[in-house]
Amino acid sequence: MNIQALLSEKVRQAMIAAGAPADCEPQVRQSAKVQFGDYQANGMMAVAKKLGMAPRQLAEQVLTHLDLNGIASKVEIAGPGFINIFLDPAFLADHVQQALASDRLDVATPEKQTIVVDYSAPNVAKEMHVGHLRSTIIGDAAVRTLEFLGHKVIRANHVGDWGTQFGMLIAWLEKQQQENAGEMELADLEGFYRDAKKHYDEDEEFAERARNYVVKLQSGDEYFREMWRKLVDITMTQNQITYDRLNVTLTRDDVMGESLYNPMLLGIVADLKAKGLAVESEGATVVFLDEFKNKEGEPMGVIIQKKDGGYLYTTTDIACAKYRYETLHADRVLYYIDSRQHQHLMQAWAIVRKAGYVPESVPLEHHMFGMMLGKDGKPFKTRAGGTVKLADLLDEALERARRLVAEKNPDMPADELEKLANAVGIGAVKYADLSKNRTTDYIFDWDNMLAFEGNTAPYMQYAYTRVLSVFRKAEINEEQLAAAPVIIREDREAQLAARLLQFEETLTVVAREGTPHVMCAYLYDLAGLFSGFYEHCPILSAENEEVRNSRLKLAQLTAKTLKLGLDTLGIETVERM
């Protein structure tokens, strides 16, 4: 149920009947304050200006055409021409019943699209670090939301599995007589990478061999392809452990690395030349883009093939966008890549559009994000100033959560404690990130994220168990409760019901904007409203059974909404804390 969409259409029709143009925007928003109703239509100002009349006068005319019978109990004009809409308690009660009767909480399915989501993208032969966290968990929250809404989602894990470093790594493995790379741990590979790089920089003979190996690998030599595959396999096996720990839905089947697009690059460069988009410049192949200017104010040159014949990330990204449209048949492509890559992506996509590889009707969206910072406001590092490995971060989260949970539950059995600590620790790390607007940097703070107060995972998980505890105490008959009516008489009942029915609107925003923090804010607000409702509207000690059952149903929908909302974020719920 999308009340905002329903009201928007009703108000728009009334505005048109009052003389507004057919493309008018009613601007229906959820009201920020209770005294302004549940929703507010703010579109009169802009339209009245076009019509040359006072906004309040237009609002009055709109009201004469606005039929919200059975939806709103009161509609009033406020200030210069805002229309405040107060939802009818009977309407709320009816839709609470409908939500409870549906596995999907009465959330509609929009027109199905094929949506490719590019996220995580670690590098082969390197362990995942904290820099991969945001892309991985924000992208996964978007994927979960889009799938819940009924879209066909293709996860694309654009791993860095190609390039000159593979010649270097294979040469070093060979030199160490470690050809059976399958038995190596990734921790060894980290050291191998450093040692290989050191030799590559210092030993010209070794570097020459590494360069030859790259050529052999790229020409498809089976021995080198097999060594390369081992490196990829070791890395992705290790990464899968991290994905599983993070409760992220990526699997090995979702890997679409840079190597996938390599066979396309020669043809793309030739095609861009044939179309007159790419030209030779100082030995390299370049596309000049009028949309981007260099320091001299001239069109910026984007290199797609170097003098030595090598390709660049831009070339791969052009091929990648083309593949996602032509082969995967994407209707929409989302990229969860940090904000520093924005210009690079915009340039690649400008070339993609000019070449006609992806039509304008298919959005290519950069859902960029800021950095994770330490308390000092600088990029998050180890005490020694090194990069924090993601596995180490999750180990620490688990250890801190274990202490926290044991403190609160000294008699809890060990296996139960471990399960709870895992849900709380991993949930805390994820929720701390997801609850911040992705476009900004954020401070990583253990104390804040593991607190049981405020907009945190432990608070949300506890809020869920608190609602469940009502049912444990109530000893309800499920069939009896299902048949009982919902009756809304108190303001706090109405406020909670209205917020519960805004779940679909919240999902719609997350699906459109790729902003999981909107869901976090909604769930936190919902938990707060339930707390106020629980305090002021007795459930188990209600004045009669009818009121008791009605309030139990509001509690039931709260529990279902919290669980489903947290699930779209990839945050695990628990039955007891």
Swiss-Prot record:
Q: Which CDD domains match?
A: Anticodon_Ia_Arg (cd07956), ArgRS_core (cd00671)
Enzyme Commission number: 6.1.1.19
Q: Which UniProt keywords apply?
A: Aminoacyl-tRNA synthetase, ATP-binding, Cytoplasm, Ligase, Nucleotide-binding, Protein biosynthesis
Cite a GO CC annotation: cytoplasm
Please cite one Gene Ontology biological process associated with this protein. Answer: arginyl-tRNA aminoacylation
Please write the reaction equations for the catalytic activity of this protein: tRNA(Arg) + L-arginine + ATP = L-arginyl-tRNA(Arg) + AMP + diphosphate
Quaternary structure and partners = Monomer.
Q: Which PANTHER family match?
A: ARGININE--TRNA LIGASE, CYTOPLASMIC, ARGINYL-TRNA SYNTHETASE
What does the similarity note say?
Answer: Belongs to the class-I aminoacyl-tRNA synthetase family.
State what protein this is by name.
Answer: Arginine--tRNA ligase
Organism field: Escherichia coli O139:H28 (strain E24377A / ETEC)
